[in-house]
Amino acid sequence: MKKMSNIYESAANTLGIFNSPCLTKVELRVACKGISDRDALSKPDPCVILKMQSHGQWFEVDRTEVIRTCINPVYSKLFTVDFYFEEVQRLRFEVHDISSNHNGLKEADFLGGMECTLGQIVSQRKLSKSLLKHGNTAGKSSITVIAEELSGNDDYVELAFNARKLDDKDFFSKSDPFLEIFRMNDDATQQLVHRTEVVMNNLSPAWKSFKVSVNSLCSGDPDRRLKCIVWDWDSNGKHDFIGEFTSTFKEMRGAMEGKQVQWECINPKYKAKKKNYKNSGMVILNQCKIHKMHSFLDYIMGGCQIQFTVAIDFTASNGDPRNSCSLHYIHPYQPNEYLKALVAVGEICQDYDSDKMFPAFGFGARIPPEYTVSHDFAINFNEDNPECAGIQGVVEAYQSCLPKLQLYGPTNIAPIIQKVAKSASEETNTKEASQYFILLILTDGVITDMADTREAIVHASHLPMSVIIVGVGNADFSDMQMLDGDDGILRSPKGEPVLRDIVQFVPFRNFKHASPAALAKSVLAEVPNQVVDYYNGKGIKPKCSSEVYESSRTLAP
């Protein structure tokens, strides 16, 4: 087990040293049940302290209020933490009995603790575990932590305006009206939110519907004032003012469900000068639709599972595993690059898979008993059930299969992409956000079936699937960069472009002198966006409804 512990330590021993942008913030609600005090005659005054691990050390992040004489506390204090999918964020919840005379921990009694990762909490949305004290359960006491995403309003709104009987500003034709909408900021400035197209020669125009984010429209404040101005377009750029009105997003929402909202378009100068002035026309909002933009955590908390699959290169270019120069050499204490990459990425993905069973395949080797070449064999040699129990199970299957293989070639990865794509394709039949597939391919050389691989990736880009390729060793991987769509659009040999960028390629040597956690951050940082892009693009909502979210706030353990 010393070997495994070294692998895990090297995979996650440097957290918090990177400055990547935070994906989102998460609120954690805490409750405890059945807390027991050392003094059986009195009830404790419990407080929960949240600690986070960084560089192998635990640091206090925040603490709840103290609830006096209570064995089943439900805390009102929320913990707010930054969430990074691409990191293992280790948390420790400690329950202390805080004396009424002291707030320091030296005088407090430690009542129990619980360790987990933030990924485990958000993937389950409600995590309940027994409190442990010195490695043993602290009586029947337990702690429950509920996660809720704290994010800005990412929804967008679709609006459709028309006007009626606008003032005519042209001598030889009718006005050419367009509409501008401005957000009134707190500092009294105005921010243009949208400008419609010009409708030529028409006093009762119907402008095309348009979409704008709620944040852009009103900064998330439905009562923020909006100024709407109607202009008569002129080719010289000196547009004529027709009229204006003010509204709010709250008022505009009155045009939902087939209703209309209308405003008088007023020219203040005309209103001041003309006694019989009524208005310069009417502006009507015919449609107000609010479109929900779901986040990565919406899908994860809604029950979407990350299905993690690994594929390992067993071609002869890796070298004889019995030789210490081989990329597959099993050192008694130092994990090889294949193991480092596998554990670094797999340790993060496993938090989002409830059964912790991971299919693991190999390619490029001759396998027993006939020793024919295979490019998608199960490394546990059980083709009917290629799954391994946890990342440790994958590591053990890898170490066990090495002596039984004949490393061969070529380096073909299209078959393994197609195998996982088949499972992802079956998932699309559910029409739900149930499973998203991540395929980790570990290879030591440039692939030899580039055309077939491009075809497979283009097909997979239409499925709930992402592909991560890690180049192991010192080969020239420059040709592999074309699979990563960052520098351009990947196309199949027939010219069909990928629907979305699903491939991330990195050479392991770029992280040789950094923690494997840095490798995981690099290859997994784009996964949340890829998940959201797929499901939002398909119009698939998270399985969990808003009502379930509300009910999840019930903190009874």
From Swiss-Prot:
Keywords: Calcium, Metal-binding, Repeat. Residues 305-507 form the VWFA domain. Ca(2+) 1 binds at residues 170, 176, 232, 234. It comes from the Eukaryota. Ca(2+) 2 binds at residues 170, 232, 234, 240. GO terms for molecular function: calcium-dependent phospholipid binding; metal ion binding. Its cofactor is Ca(2+). Signal peptide: none annotated. Probable calcium-dependent phospholipid-binding protein that may play a role in calcium-mediated intracellular processes. Belongs to the copine family. Interacts (via VWFA domain) with ACTB, BCOR, BICD2, CCDC22, CDC42BPB, CEP162, MYCBP2, NONO, PDCD6, PITPNM2, RDX, SKIL, SKT, SPTBN1, UBE2O and WTAP. This is Copine-4. The gene is Cpne4.
